[in-house]
Each structure stands twice: as structure tokens, then as C-alpha cells.
């Protein structure tokens, strides 16, 4: 098995391919159906190709999509599968989206009060 995730439970392993945004793949690789989505993200993160322009730094930067549905971190592979969308032959293709964590936003300071504009003329008569 390529990754664990909490007990075998006698479930059959599943072959999964992770498709990246540029069309390249990680895998296919075998995963236990009890593997959590978080463990799948860790698997992808550990095998991310070097030299890619966009690369995740943490598991939170990775989103996995299967059959058009964003997979939740606490769910297992078995709970996240869509049997109607899967081919009986070959691996399940899951799409990987990288979304960088946004840095914490600084609280905007209210604009400083401007000094009142002078009203009047600055002309000198000779």
C-alpha cells in the first residue's frame, strides 16, 4: 500500500492517479480505502514534482477533486468515491488544485485626517 490512514478493515485497495493542473500525473498508486483525504494530500505533497512553477507548501494548499466534488479532509477514500463516475478498469483519476494559503490580512488603518484646505486667493497686488 502506498499510504495508510487508519486500519485496513478488510477493504480492497484502490488504484488512484493524481492529475496536476499542467496535465502531468502523480501515480497511479495503490491506496487503502480507509486512507483519509488528508493522508492523500500528504502523499501528493511528498511526491510533488520538483521545478514546478506553482507548488504547495502545506496540506492546506492542496485541494483534491473527484468526479467534480471537492473532497473533505476528514473523510476516507471509501467515503469519497463516486462509483457511478469511475471506470471499472484502470485507476481513479483525482484532480489536484493548488491554492496558496493567503497571508493574514493586516487591518487597514483609517486614512489620516488631512489639514483643511485654504480658501482664498494668494495674489499680491502691486
From Swiss-Prot:
Residues 14-79 form the Ubiquitin-like domain. It is a lipid-anchor. A lipid is attached at residue 123 (S-geranylgeranyl cysteine). It is found in: Cell membrane. One of its GO terms (cellular component) is plasma membrane. The modification Cysteine methyl ester is found at residue 123. Residues 124-126 form a propeptide. Keywords: Cell membrane, Lipoprotein, Membrane, Methylation, Prenylation. InterPro entries: MUB, Ubiquitin-like_domsf, UBL3-like, UBL3-like_ubiquitin_dom. May serve as docking site to facilitate the association of other proteins to the plasma membrane. This is Membrane-anchored ubiquitin-fold protein 2. It comes from Oryza sativa subsp. japonica. The gene is MUB2.
